[in-house]
């Protein structure tokens, strides 16, 4: 553990310790909390910029509100490292995102101070509204519910759906809009802070309500004029007309790094007797750490780094990551086809589409955190003859499943889905694991579902998708590097629904769907050394299956094992159903499917987790030896 000097923070284990401090100590506490956060993340890696941006807000919220009785719900959750330090988890903060350590997000089973788990964006207001309504039903009049949501997350429709509902219900809910990017209405110094304090005071609210009651007794013409005049004045001075229309009482904008501004406003809104309130705070990602302030995008998620220089520790490698291979392949295809366009949902760098945007800026569309819109937007482009590639993480594609079915699949529109971060993703854990895309896509009629076994196969699949116009098509690939093979300038077009055999044998058939192929080949070597002749097949397609190849493998082998990084119901399940329908399970063939277990996988090292669940060479060999009844003796 690094020797960070934090004498005041050392006195705070839980929020009640924080609330025992004089208010004049809080600036020093915030500075120490920021120092501790920087030092901890330098050891573990993780999300840095977002947490540094809410240090003062975190201190203020736990100081003003009676947590955990009052509920603070953090949207997404990657900004909660300071929150974790203040809520009894400082001793474990240097285990963040490590196996057996703290989650990088909020997690209900981890602490009573995490009332709602997160990892995906834009859920906090809906969850908070549910809790606020539950408190009202139970007549818990003292409990406050606070949802903290970033301006980026406000680009998702779900946030506005929740606000609309909260306004209609007149629920006692406090929403903190953490504006650290869009600058909807940046604060303008002391005047803005003064106005925020003014409009948050009970006296202003009571006056406003009395004027409203009086105006309602006047003819409608006068009431409409009065309402519009007030909206104009408040919108001109302090913003917030949109939120007013949704039924929220708007306060702000205020400086989210100035405790002298935050504390009085939060005290005032804490006592607001009824209806939802929105407090607009403006913050800066990476606040207080110059390298992060200078490059907030690069310090959103970081590897371990040197605190003094800010230099991140990265393993040197000349092997391209799968994301980079996809990016280069898509740019190459777009050079040959002017109908190709790229679409991302607020992840241009993570999906590699930033390179596409540099080359074809007019054909690149970042729609914000709006996966549902992204898919239907792509469907509209496909209707007009364009070839949209929707590049999206597997875990986020789940958010657009109705659009995939209703707007794309039923209409057989040729939308291309480039599914990044497929399979186990490591430190981000269950909320980000790409476990389910094979299952929920391969069940759709006439939906082509592909997975490459290496980076060259990924290039082939990008070109295949670009050439395919008969309906929707997808290809999935993992986080991390390929295997380091030489790559051509451009991939080849694959025959739809046709796999390939990499190695011929006659007793054991190993059928791989995806990038576990290197482990499958190692397993085949070990089985061969034990006298078990092994065929290795690259399925390429989960849908449509290569039926001819699967029939041959079933008829010519004693044991057939499928290998995939995905949940129950994926490639192995589809192959088993085909074999059953064909009567190929009735003549002694023994089939096993290696996949994810029926549970959510927690954060940890990908190599260790995949080994534990049997998706490495040793696990494959053990499975085969168990089936054939041999004693397992592995070196």
Swiss-Prot record:
Family annotation (Pfam families): DXP_synthase_N, Transket_pyr, Transketolase_C
InterPro entries per the UniProt record, alphabetical: Dxylulose-5-P_synthase, THDP-binding, Transketo_C/PFOR_II, Transketolase-like_Pyr-bd, Transketolase_C, Transketolase_CS
Catalytic reactions on record: D-glyceraldehyde 3-phosphate + pyruvate + H(+) = 1-deoxy-D-xylulose 5-phosphate + CO2
Molecular function GO terms recorded: 1-deoxy-D-xylulose-5-phosphate synthase activity; magnesium ion binding; thiamine pyrophosphate binding
Ranges that cross the membrane: none
Enzyme class per UniProt: transferase
Protein's GO biological process: 1-deoxy-D-xylulose 5-phosphate biosynthetic process; glyceraldehyde-3-phosphate metabolic process; terpenoid biosynthetic process; thiamine biosynthetic process
Enzyme Commission (EC) number: 2.2.1.7
Cofactor note as given: Binds 1 Mg(2+) ion per subunit. Binds 1 thiamine pyrophosphate per subunit.
UniProt keyword list: Isoprene biosynthesis, Magnesium, Metal-binding, Thiamine biosynthesis, Thiamine pyrophosphate, Transferase
Record-listed thiamine diphosphate binding positions: 78, 119-121, 152-153, 180, 289, 371
Cofactor(s) the protein requires to work: Mg(2+); thiamine diphosphate
Listed PANTHER family: 1-D-DEOXYXYLULOSE 5-PHOSPHATE SYNTHASE-RELATED (PTHR43322), 1-DEOXY-D-XYLULOSE-5-PHOSPHATE SYNTHASE, CHLOROPLASTIC (PTHR43322:SF5)
Protein task: Catalyzes the acyloin condensation reaction between C atoms 2 and 3 of pyruvate and glyceraldehyde 3-phosphate to yield 1-deoxy-D-xylulose-5-phosphate (DXP).
Protein name: 1-deoxy-D-xylulose-5-phosphate synthase
Species in which this protein is naturally found: Bartonella tribocorum (strain CIP 105476 / IBS 506)
Upper lineage: Bacteria, Pseudomonadati, Pseudomonadota, Alphaproteobacteria, Hyphomicrobiales
Gene name of the record: dxs
């Amino acid at each position: 553990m690094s020797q960070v000097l934090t004498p005041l923070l050392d006195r705070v284990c839980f929020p009640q310790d924080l609330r025992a401090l004089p208010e004049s100590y809080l600036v020093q506490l915030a500075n120490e909390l920021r120092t501790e956060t920087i030092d901890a993340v330098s050891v573990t890696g993780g999300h840095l910029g977002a947490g540094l941006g809410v240090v003062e807000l975190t201190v203020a919220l736990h100081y003003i509100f009676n947590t955990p009785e009052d509920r603070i719900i953090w949207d997404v959750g990657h900004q909660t490292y300071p929150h974790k330090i203040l809520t009894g988890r400082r001793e474990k903060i240097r285990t963040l995102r490590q196996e057996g350590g703290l989650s990088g997000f909020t997690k209900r089973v981890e602490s009573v101070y995490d009332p709602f788990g997160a990892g995906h964006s834009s859920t906090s207001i809906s969850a908070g509204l549910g809790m606020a309504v539950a408190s009202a039903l139970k007549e818990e009049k003292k409990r406050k519910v606070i949802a903290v949501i970033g301006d980026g997350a406000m680009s998702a429709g779900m946030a506005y759906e929740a606000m609309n509902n909260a306004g209609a219900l007149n629920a006692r809910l406090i929403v903190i809009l953490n504006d650290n990017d869009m600058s909807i209405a940046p604060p303008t110094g002391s005047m803005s802070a003064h106005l925020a304090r003014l409009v948050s005071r009970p006296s202003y609210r009571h006056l406003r309500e009395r004027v409203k009651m009086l105006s309602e007794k006047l003819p409608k013409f006068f009431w409409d004029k009065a309402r519009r005049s007030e909206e104009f004045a408040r919108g001109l001075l302090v913003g917030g007309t949109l939120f007013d229309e949704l039924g929220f009482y708007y306060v702000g904008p205020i400086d989210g790094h100035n405790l002298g501004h935050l504390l009085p406003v939060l005290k005032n809104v804490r006592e607001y007797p009824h209806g939802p309130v929105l407090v607009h705070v403006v913050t800066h990602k990476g606040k207080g750490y110059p390298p992060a302030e200078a490059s907030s995008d690069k310090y959103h998620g970081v590897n371990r780094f040197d605190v003094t220089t800010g230099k991140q520790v990265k393993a040197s490698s000349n092997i391209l990551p799968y994301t980079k291979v996809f990016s280069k392949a898509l740019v190459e295809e777009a050079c040959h086809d002017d109908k190709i366009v790229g679409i991302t949902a607020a992840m241009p760098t993570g999906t590699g589409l930033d390179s596409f945007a540099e080359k074809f800026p007019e054909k690149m569309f970042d729609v914000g955190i709006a996966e549902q819109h992204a898919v239907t937007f792509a469907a509209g482009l496909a209707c007009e003859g364009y070839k949209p590639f929707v590049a999206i993480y597997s875990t986020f594609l789940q958010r657009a499943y109705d659009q995939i079915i209703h707007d794309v699949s039923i209409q057989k529109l040729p939308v291309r889905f480039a599914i990044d971060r497929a399979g186990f993703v490591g430190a981000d854990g269950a909320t980000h694991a790409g476990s389910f895309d094979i299952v929920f896509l391969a069940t759709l009629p006439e939906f082509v579902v592909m997975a490459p076994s290496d980076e060259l196969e990924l290039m082939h699949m990008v070109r295949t998708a670009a050439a395919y116009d008969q309906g929707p098509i997808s290809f999935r690939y993992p986080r991390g590097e390929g295997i380091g093979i030489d790559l051509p300038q451009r991939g080849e077009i694959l025959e739809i629904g046709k796999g390939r055999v990499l190695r011929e044998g006659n007793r054991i058939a190993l059928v791989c769907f995806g990038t576990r192929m290197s482990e499958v080949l190692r397993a085949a070597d070990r089985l061969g050394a034990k006298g078990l002749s092994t065929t290795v097949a690259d399925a390429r397609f989960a849908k449509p299956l290569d039926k001819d190849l699967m029939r041959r493998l079933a008829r010519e082998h004693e044991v057939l094992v499928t290998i995939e990084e995905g949940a129950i119901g994926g490639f192995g399940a589809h192959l088993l159903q085909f074999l059953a329908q064909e009567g190929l399970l009735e003549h002694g063939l023994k089939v096993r499917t290696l996949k994810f277990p029926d549970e959510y996988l927690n954060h940890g090292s990908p190599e260790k987790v995949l080994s534990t669940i049997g998706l490495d060479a040793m696990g494959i060999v053990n499975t085969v030896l168990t089936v054939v009844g041999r004693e397992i003796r592995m070196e």
